[in-house]
Every structure is written in structure tokens, then in C-alpha cells.
Amino acid sequence: MRAWRYNAAMTQPISRFPVPRLDELPEDIRARILAVEEKAGFIPNVFMVLAHRPDEFRAFFAYHDALMLKEGRLSKGEREMIVVATSAANECHSCVIAHGALVRVYEKQPLLADQVATNYRKADITPRQRAMLDFAMKVALRSAEIEEADFARLREHGFSDEDGWDIAGIAAFFGMSNRIANATGMRPNDEFYLMGRVPRAR
């Protein structure tokens, strides 16, 4: 079985903590990781890093899926835009790179993720998406200042209060994820850098 201590280039460790081998993992976690590999063509390092703590792995991805895979007014691309903007504010290299790739894939705009990460206010986004990211950034950086006027602005752009909860939940969840990634020294896969920029190899 493969060892995942190092990234694809085999030059830097993907975590400062021990990274388990696939054959050491509980069956449910191994099955999930292999399913991701089948779909993506590689195993994102976040799965192997978090698998160091199986119970927390399960809890993390259960909440992740509840936020990111649910039906609602937020598209998959918009959810990922929230992750990229707030992760950039939290200076999480791993999350910006990995989720920036998903923004490019879902939105089919190769420049958008970089724009959102560096200054979403100047990105090629709609007024609705600007309002969404303004709210997400306030949750990420100044949540104690959130008031009814913030929800009123979301409503002006067609969001419901439940959508506001979704935006807040994503910003808050990935605030935790950013900090875990930074504390563990998690590195993004090399594959993420080119996703959505060049055609996927067949």
C-alpha cells in the first residue's frame, strides 16, 4: 500500500503529524478515500492528513457534506467561492489552492479563483455574489458585528435567511478547517494548481 507522508513531487511532507497508510484505515474511511480517488484521479491530501484521527475525520466530512452538498440557492461554485475568499483572509494556503481549483472547475472561469482569493471586491462576480462574499467575510472576520441589516442586504439580492445561515456555516466551518490545515502544516496536492486551467489528462 502507498505511503502518503510526502506530496506528489516527494519533496515536502503533507503534514507534520503521522499520515496513515490506506491499509491501516477503518473500512468506511478507506472506502470514502478510494471513491474520491476514483472520481478525481488522485487522493486530496486533506483526506490522508485528517485520517490520522478517524473519529474527527468522520465528523469533519459529515458536517462538510451537510454544508457543501445540500440543495439550496447557493451553487456549488458559489459555495467554493466562499471557501476561497474566507480561507484567503485566514491565510490558509492549502485551502485556497484546493478550493480555488474547485471554483475554476465549477464556474468554468480559469481566472476567477485568483481574483476571489486576492481581492473579491474586484473579481468578475455578480452583485449577488458580492453581497454573499461580503456577508461571508463579516462572519469570518467580524462576526460579533453581524446585525439585522446584514441579513436585509442578503434579502435584497434574493437570499433567504436560511441562505444566510448556509453562508455563515460555510465561512465558520472553513475557519476551523483553515486553522487545522495551518496547524498540521497541510500541503495541497500539486494537481490542484493546474485543475481548471489546463484540460484534464485522459
Where are these regions (language model features)?
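Hydrophobic alpha-helical segments
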Residues: R2-R202
